[in-house]
Each structure stands twice: as C-alpha cells, then as structure tokens.
Amino acid sequence: RPRRGSSLQSGGDRPTIDRLEPRTVSFPSSYPVGGIVIDTKGRQLFLVQSPTEALRYPISVGREGFSWTGAETISRKAEWPDWHPPEEMRWRDPRLPEKMTGGIKNPLGAMALYLGSSLYRIHGTNDATSIGRAASSGCFRMLNGHVVDLAARVDIGTGVQVVHRLPPELEKVVADQVAPPEAPKPAVTKRSRPS
C-alpha cells in the first residue's frame, strides 16, 4: 500500500483577491434569469442576466471519466475553504493530506460555491493554467478573481444547470463572440514619387 500524506497541511497565505469582471455576451435562451449554466464541452460558465444576455467565465471541467451533467443549487459559499480530499482521491494520490487549510496553495482557491449535497463545487484554483482544460475530478475551477466575482452575484439557492453542450443555435451565437478578434490590418498609404 502506498505511503499516506500528512493528516494536515497548510494552504498558505490568504491574500485579498480582487473581483475580476467577466465578459457580457449575447445569450438568447430560455434558461432562468439569475441562474448558472455550465457548458462542459465549451468549458464556460454563464450567469444568465436576461433572456438575451449572460456573463461568461472561462472554467476548467472534469477530466475524462469525471465529468457529469444535471441540475443542482448552490447550497453554501465558503471563502478560503479547507479542502478534505475524498478517500478515493487520496487512494489515487497517496501524497494528499486528509485536510488542507484554506489558502493560496489550496486547490479550492479563494472561494467555493457548494453544489447541493454533492462533493462538487464551483471554486477557485491554485493553478490558473488549468482554466480552459478538462483537469478536475468533477468540480468546476475558475480564476480566483472570477469566482469571487460570481460569488458576489449569486445567492444560496441559485440554480445551476450543468450541460454537456449548449443547444446548437446558442452554441453558435456564443462561439461567434469568443473567437479571437481579427488582427487589424495595417493601413496602406500611397507615396507619391518625387518628381
């Protein structure tokens, strides 16, 4: 049997994290206003603002074998949460502690929004490079500034819809807005020849 990690590990400092504003995008849909929609294929989280607009946040999703879909509600919010890796996660990686206190080194980051009575959360991260990838064990990672912003905008009881992909028409509208902007073309000026 592999060697076990320590029972308690420090998560490090807890600096003040400023809110990072998300991008407002066109989001014509029938999803409930005020609700959260998570598109696992697109690796995006949307906070629906109106029947036609949403705030868009890039996220990290569950890696293969750890992704899921369904409906939940936010049951709790915690700033700089402690992390208690589940036994099966500790079995896969015996170096993990039984508990890591909240802090900048903690994988849950600056804030966690707990989803129902499940072990899943929308949370910050200690690894910003994981955003946009399938890298978690089923949770949804955000940049710390983004999760702080989202937490300030939602309440306990907010509905969360996790979908594999958005409906095709909506997916196209959103994709057209997230494509990188075209590089500006240099202006061409004609030079007159000296006479």
What are these regions (language model features)?
Residues 2-81:
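Cell wall/extracellular polymer interaction/catalysis modules
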Residues 56-59, 86, 162-163:
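Surface-exposed patches in mature extracellular/periplasmic domains of secreted proteins
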Residues 51, 65-66, 70, 82, ...:
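Exported/periplasmic cell-wall-interacting domains
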Residues 12, 86-89:
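General structural signal for secondary-structure boundaries
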